[in-house]
Amino acid sequence: MYTELISHKIAELKKERKAVILAHNYQLGEIQEAADFVGDSLELARKAANIDAEVIVFCGVHFMAETAAILSPEKTVLAPEPKAGCPMADMISGAELREFKARYPGLPVVCYVNSTAEVKAESDICCTSANAVKVVESLKSDTVLFVPDQYLGAFVQAHTAKKIISWPGYCPCHARIKPEDILNLKKHYPKAKVVVHPESRPEVTALADGVLSTGQMVTYAARADVKELIVGTEIGMLYRLRKENPNKLFIPVSEQAVCANMKMTTLPKLLASLENMQTVVSVPEEIRRKAVGAVERMLKVT
């Protein structure tokens, strides 16, 4: 009853504020239910760029709301939980990227969207896990600097003839997934397919039937030949997969694959965000102008 009351208030305020709620696939189920659109980073970036709304309420982590603010400076972007950060995004700063570039002068920088606006501003083009290979292939250079995720960089390296020089960042959540997690589950579910996120270690991706972004996992799970699926990503993903495929079995590869930051946004916080129009996420115009080029170039590639 309490949840229904809050959800009703959120729906009313959303209309009043001319707001749209975007939520990442890793968000709590109650947040996914309240959202107008649930998706992966690429899908959410596209929505933020084209959505017809005065206010975007972004239920995810800080860099996602920042990306929306970069793409839609005329809109008000709200983060219901401003403390929801991303450990991987914090593994490289703008200054560190400038030093990295100085060591390899002239090489283009591909920046994973899981990064700060300052880092995007120092990059040539952004990518997501859904389009990283395509983005790298779009560049003329035979050698590319890739930040901040070394494991996504390794995945791209396995699918391109170009040389990838990666920054040594990683997602702690996906790094917790081990090969033995998959091997043990395959003993219990021998007919199950295995999908993992490309932020996973190479020894994990080597065991998968598909190495996919969360949006691509949604498509894969809907296939008629998939009855049982071992899912190697943050466990919030299973809520959507089970909801959209109620007659299929979804098994998390590891109960340890939890992103605490993704779980910080709750219905009461979402309601408070709309009531008080907080917390507004903005990017200094000098940084935004430089960063928007990298994000828009990515969207043109895909």
Curated annotation (Swiss-Prot):
Q: Where in the cell is it found?
A: Cytoplasm
The top EC class, named as a word, is transferase
Keyword Hydrolase part of the UniProt annotation? no
Which reaction is catalysed here?
Answer: iminosuccinate + dihydroxyacetone phosphate = quinolinate + phosphate + 2 H2O + H(+)
Positions annotated to bind iminosuccinate? 24, 41, 112-114, 129, 197-199, 214
What EC number(s) has UniProt assigned to this enzyme?
2.5.1.72
Keyword Translocase recorded: no
Tell me the cofactor note: Binds 1 [4Fe-4S] cluster per subunit.
Q: In which pathway does it act?
A: Cofactor biosynthesis; NAD(+) biosynthesis; quinolinate from iminoaspartate: step 1/1
Write out the residues that bind [4Fe-4S] cluster: 86, 171, 259
An example GO BP is: 'de novo' NAD biosynthetic process from L-aspartate
According to its UniProt entry, what is the function of this protein? Catalyzes the condensation of iminoaspartate with dihydroxyacetone phosphate to form quinolinate.
Q: What is this protein called?
A: Quinolinate synthase
Name its species: Dehalococcoides mccartyi (strain ATCC BAA-2266 / KCTC 15142 / 195)
